[in-house]
Amino acid sequence: LPTNFVRDVIMKASGKDIMNSMTRSVLTLGSYDDTLNDTSLSNVLRQCLMLISEFPMLAVYGYRAYSHYERNKSLYIHRPDMSLSTAENILRMLRPDKKFTKLEALVLDIALVLHMEHGGGNNSTFTTRVVTSSGSDTYSVMAAALCSLKGPKHGGANIKVQQMMKDLKKHVKDTSD
């Protein structure tokens, strides 16, 4: 990420919604790209690969800001370790002690793959195709796709799963039954 990006963009404009934080961050990253409006295949590929490499940091740092400012948790920022996988880095950056097990990393890695490969006809893919067809820049396209993930009929379903799990934990005393 650009110098001071985490401090100036993510931490100073934290919010209650991680998807909004990530969308804002993606749009802001476009202002750092001198080739923002170059829609050649080679440039778009470069931009997409760069964004793919930055998404884990945007998610983790957005969550850390939310956790600190909205939930009054301690603030700590861990930089990624280039010798680790994406899943390992996410777990390492999320935890105060940076510790995780190989099993946790494997489970997260599989979950990430499943989320990426769940089908080609979903809302975010459709949104990406529509906005791309207008000739828009990569950052605007990705921000639009992120916005489509937020709705309760798409990515918002994950929020409903979290709410259901909290409700089950609260109301089911013996989970082994």
Regions found by a protein language model. Give the residues of each.
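Hydrophobic alpha-helical bundle cores within soluble ligand-binding/oligomerization subdomains
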Residues: L1-D177
